[in-house]
Amino acid sequence: MSSPILFAIACLIWGSTFWAITLQLGDVAPAVSIVYRFGLASATLFSWCLLRGDRLRMPWKVQRWMMLQGVATFAISYVCTYTSEQYLVSALVAVLFVLMVFWTPICNRFMFGTPLTWRMWSAAAVSICGVILLFYEPISHAWNDILAGGSGHFLLGLGLALCATVTSTIGNVVVVKVREESSNVFLTMAWAMFWGTLAVASWALLTGVEFRLPSRPSYWAGLLYLSLFGSVIAFGAYFTLIHRIGSQKAVYIGVVTPVISVLLSIQLEHYRPGAMEWFGMVLCLSSVAWALKAPSPAKNEPSIPLESKLEAP
C-alpha cells in the first residue's frame, strides 16, 4: 500500500473517531463504553501478537510503566473525553487535543530536563490565543447561563476535555520508559489498554455503574469502528508510514485530523462556527504545524516516542 494511501487512512480514521464517540453516548455510562472498546481492542492486539509468535509475558519493571500509561491514557483521559463530548461538539474536543503537541515537551522538560525552544513557546502562545478565540463566545454564553441559574455544563465539558489532553500527554511521556525496556509497540499497547480497561472497569463497579448491552445497532457499529479501526488499524498505518517517510512528516497527521473532525461536526452535528471560531481554529492548527517544523532535539536529549507525538481518541 502506498504512503499517500496510508496517510489518508490514518487521517480519515483518527479524524472521525471524535464523532464516532458520540455514537457511544446515551445508552450506557461512558465508563462502560470505554471498557467495551479497549477490552475488544486489547484482545485484538494480543491475538495479533500471538499470531506473530510474540511472547505475551512482560517483566514487572515494564508492567509498572505500562500500568501507569494505561491508567493515564486509556482510563482517565478517555473517561474525560467521552464525558466531555456529552456537553461539547466533537470538533471542539478534537481541536483541543492538538494542545498535546505543547504539553508533551513541557512534561519532558519536568521529567527529563529536555530544553524548550523559543519556537515552541511562541507557537504555544499563538495556539492559546487561538483556543481563547475559539471558546470565547461559548464560554460567555455558558457563564451567562450560570448567572441566570443554569447548569453551565459547557464549562464542565471544556474542563474535562482539557484534563483529557493533559492526562493523555502524561501517559505518552511515560511511554519513554516503556520503550527503554521493550520495542514491541503492539504488545505494549495491548498491555496498556488492558490495564486501562481494568482500571475503568474496577472504578465503574465500585461506583455502582450498570453494565448492560445496548440494543441500538449504531452503538455497536461505533464500538467496532473505534476498537478495530481507531485503536488498531490506524496505528498500524501510522507506524508503517513512520518507517517509510519518517516521523517528522508522519506527525502532520495530527494537523489534518482536527480539520476532518470539524468538517464531520458541521455535517453530522450541525456545528456552525462563526468567524471568530474559524479564526481561532486556524491560529491553533497553524501554530501546531509551525511547532512541528521545529529543529530536532540534540543527540544527548531523551527522544520523544513516536506515538507520543500523536494521540487520537
Tell me what each language-model feature is.
Residues 1-4, 27-31, 35, 58-64, ...:
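Juxtamembrane helix-entry segments on the extracytoplasmic side of multipass membrane proteins
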Residues 12-13, 17-20, 46-97, 103, ...:
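Specific transmembrane alpha-helical segments of multi-pass solute transporters/efflux pumps
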Residues 15, 39-43, 128, 194-198, ...:
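Small-residue-rich packing faces within the transmembrane alpha-helices of Major Facilitator Superfamily
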Residues 27-76, 103, 166-174, 189-208, ...:
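Transmembrane alpha-helices of multi-pass small-molecule transport proteins
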Residues 32-43, 73, 78-124, 247-266:
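Specific alpha-helical transmembrane segments that line the substrate/conduction pathway
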Residues 34-36, 90-99, 174-197, 227-267:
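Helix-helix packing/entry segments at the starts of transmembrane helices
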Residues 45, 99, 116-139, 145, ...:
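Hydrophobic transmembrane alpha-helices of multi-pass small-molecule transport proteins
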Residues 45, 104-106, 110, 141-208, ...:
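Transmembrane alpha-helical segments that form core, pore/gating elements
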